[in-house]
Structure formats: C-alpha cells, structure tokens
UniProtKB/Swiss-Prot annotation:
It is found in: Cytoplasm. Keywords: Cytoplasm, GTP-binding, Hydrolase, Magnesium, Metal-binding, Nucleotide-binding. Mg(2+) binds at S172, T192. Its cofactor is Mg(2+). Its EC number is 3.6.5.-. It comes from Staphylococcus aureus (strain NCTC 8325 / PS 47). Belongs to the TRAFAC class OBG-HflX-like GTPase superfamily. OBG GTPase family. It comes from the Bacteria. The gene is obg. This is GTPase Obg. Residues 352-430 form the OCT domain.
Length: 430
C-alpha cells in the first residue's frame, strides 16, 4: 500500500535541570557554588533516505517524543546532551506545520536534514548566577521545554514516469503487466485512489520507476474529484504517459479526452504543458478502436506520435517501454524538480521552527483575574523552580524588568488582585 500524506505529533526533548550545589572539599572553607548545568534536550530531525519510497512507517506510529537532557551534577559537572531523534523519510517529502500550513522543509536529496522541533536548552546551575553581591546563590534553573508541534508529511512522488488519463483507461492494468506492482483493478471508475509505484525493466535491461496515478476528470485543476490530490504527484515526473481509451467504450470521444486532460495539466501548472509526453492509444483489441485512432491522428496531426497498445492482449507493450526509456534518456539531464522549486522560491530547507518572540499580552478572565501570556514570559515561567524562594524572587525581578508590573498597573491591577501565567496563580503585591 502507498501512503503519500500523514499527520504526526512531535515533541522535542526538554533540557535537563541545573542544580543547586556547593563545593565541600576539605581545605576549601569558602567553596562557593558548584551546581552544573543541565544537558540540551534532543531535537527532532528529519533525514532523507533514498532507500525509502513511502510514508508507510508513519501510519502506525503518529507520536514521536525525543529524549530529555540529563540534569546537572555537583562539582560543576554538566548534564549530557540528549541525542537527536532522527526520523527517516523518502526523497520528495514536504513537511508542513499543521496549525499554520507553513512549509518547514522540502527534502529532496539523500542525506539532507532539517531540524523541525528544537530541543530545549539545559537549565543553568547555581554557579552561573554567582555575582560579587551574591557569591553563593541558592537557586538554579529548570531545563527549557522542547518544542512541540503537529506536522503533516506530504510525499511528492519522485517517479520517472507518471501515467495520466481519465478513469478506467487501463493505467493500473498497464502497471501490473510491466512491473511487479499489484494495483487494485476493477470495472468501475476511481479504482485507484492512491498512487501505486512499480519498477519497470525493458527487454534491453533499462529500468525506470512508473507511477499509476488516480484518474482525472474535468475540473481537476480546481480540485474536482481527486484533482489536486492527483496533480501534485505529476509535478516531479520526468515523462508523462497519457493513456486514452481509443474504443470510446465509456461514451467519450478520444480526442476530447486528450484535450481535457492536457487542459487540466496546464491549468494546474503551466510547465506541465511542456513536459515530455507519450500518447498511448489503449484498448486497440476492441471494435471501432482502429477507426477512432485514424480520426484521432488526423485531428492532432503528425507532430504528436501515438503508440497503439492493448493491455489485455499485451500487443505492442514492449515497443511502448522502449519509447518511454528512450524519452527518459533524452531528458535525463533535465532536472524538472529544481526548476519548479526555483520558480516558486522554495529552498530545500526553508524553515526551522522558531516561536515568535512577542513580548507579552495581558487579558482578563471571566472571574476578573489578569492573564499574562507570551513566548518569552511563558518560557521563563517553565524554567523557574517555584519550590525555591530565591528562584521565585528572581522570576519577580524578571517580570519587572520586562515591564509586566507597570503594564498590569496600567490595566487597573491593584494590590491583592490575581495574576495568572499558564497554570500558575500569583497575587499582585505593590
């Protein structure tokens, strides 16, 4: 089974906690602070593995949590950094933030990496806070929480050849007889609803990857039917094999099928109109196919070669494979993927998840309590050990230095009012 789109949840590792400790060696009467820093939490990293072809592994595991950094130790020993969690994906994987729909990375080349969820910084030990005024601080810092987000993985096929055409023209049947792929084949429309991949070998030992793609209908470029779901896979194929039911058994005219499909390709992406294309006249074993083929050739002209085949009797299949292999060799040095990436301004690694560092905002709850929110203040809240009075006093000083106290007063906050930050409640004291 081919899986080309999946949503997963990521949680980078929290940083290790710094500790409060002091030197206690013999002959060191004023040892001072000796608490070590916590280690860095593991990041979630995606890496391209060219041996993979699908996102199937992510179908059975949707939640990924990276390791926490080790806590600091006494004698100024720092905790060990956690090893990054590396998730392998096939070439052509696009990673998007589910909440914002922002593209985080477009991974194409083998070994290419992108950090999508960054591990938390390790908390600082008490030795980091020593000053001339306070040479032996009795507080330390908790580790920074790792980033947490939901992402969608979308695999754009990197097949060499894409089979396109109306439903039930024989695309799946062709793939099944020229490769070991076993797509679902049925006597009804849209038997194929997910792409199927197959490795095809020609009689002269040339090989390529062929993709049987869901059938198109008129309006696909506007999202009708399986439209966009189908068309995004065509973008990275080097050669398009356009299959047409030359028998007209579905009640459609072959020439109209040909025109509609090409119009939909061009409407979705202008460059697809100029992509190398091989026209295949299928079902030549049925009555009226030859007459329809003659009319078809007259209509499109001699400049467009047409290869007549029958996927049922397998007539002319080898000649079709030779023609595809020849066309691939002709365009082997053309990188359509790079052209498309440059045309839309997409770098191969676009973005590393970084929360916006807005200062803070103040709102009111229904019970009248003041709610302070913002990435910076929430980060400080999470890294403060509220079991330590000195750490709490430091947090209060940080709030004052950020201007939160003054902002609360401007909003009407008075002595004794409740202030909330995340899950914590504080009493405002003048």
């Amino acid at each position: 089974m081919f899986v080309d789109q999946v949503k997963i949840s990521l949680k980078a590792g929290d940083g290790g906690n710094g500790i409060t400790a002091y030197r206690r060696e013999k002959y060191v009467p004023f040892g001072g602070p000796a608490g070590g820093d916590g280690g860095k939490g593991a990041s979630v990293v995606f890496e391209v593995d060219e041996g993979l072809r699908t996102l199937l592994d992510f179908r059975y595991q949707r939640h990924f949590k990276a390791s926490k950094g080790e806590n600091g130790q006494s004698s100024n020993m720092h905790g060990k950094n956690a090893e990054d969690l590396v998730l392998k994906v096939p070439p052509g994987t696009i990673i998007k933030n589910v909440e914002t729909d922002e593209v985080l990375a477009d991974l194409v080349e083998d070994g290419q990496r992108a950090v999508v969820a960054k591990g938390g910084r390790g908390g600082r030990g008490n030795s980091r806070f020593a000053t001339p005024r306070n040479p032996a601080p009795d507080f330390s810092e908790k580790g920074e929480p790792g980033e947490e987000l939901d992402v969608s993985l979308e695999l754009k096929l990197l097949a060499d050849v894409g089979l396109v055409g109306f439903p039930s023209v024989g695309k799946s049947t062709l793939l099944s007889i020229v490769s070991k792929a076993k797509p679902k084949i049925g006597a009804y429309h849209f038997t194929t609803i997910k792409p199927n991949l197959g490795v095809v070998s020609t009689p002269d030992q040339r090989s390529f990857v062929m993709a049987d793609l869901p059938g198109l209908i008129e309006g696909a470029s506007d999202g009708v039917g399986l439209g966009h779901q189908f068309l995004r896979h065509v973008e990275r194929t080097k050669v398009i094999v356009h299959m047409i039911d030359m028998s007209g058994s579905e009640g459609r005219e072959p020439i109209e099928d040909y025109k509609v499909i090409n119009q939909e390709l061009a409407a979705y992406e202008q460059r697809l109109e100029d992509r190398p294309q091989i026209v295949v006249a299928n079902k030549m074993d049925l009555p009226e196919s030859q007459d329809n083929l003659n009319l078809f050739k007259e209509e499109i002209g001699e400049d467009v070669p047409v290869i007549p085949v029958s996927t049922i009797t397998r007539d002319n299949i080898d000649q079709l494979l030779y023609a595809i292999a020849d066309k691939l060799e002709e365009y082997k040095d053309v990188d359509f993927t790079v052209e498309e990436e440059e045309s839309v301004g997409i770098n191969r690694v676009l973005y590393k998840h970084t929360p916006s560092q807005d200062k803070f905002t103040i709102s009111r709850d229904d019970d009248g309590a003041y709610v302070v929110s913002g990435n910076a203040i929430e980060r400080m809240f999470k890294m403060t050990d509220f079991n330590s009075d000195p750490a709490v006093r430091r947090f209060a000083r940080q709030m004052r230095s950020m201007g939160i106290d003054d902002a609360l007063r401007e909003r009407g906050c008075k002595n004794g009012d409740i202030v909330r930050i995340l899950g914590g409640e504080f009493e405002f004291v003048e």
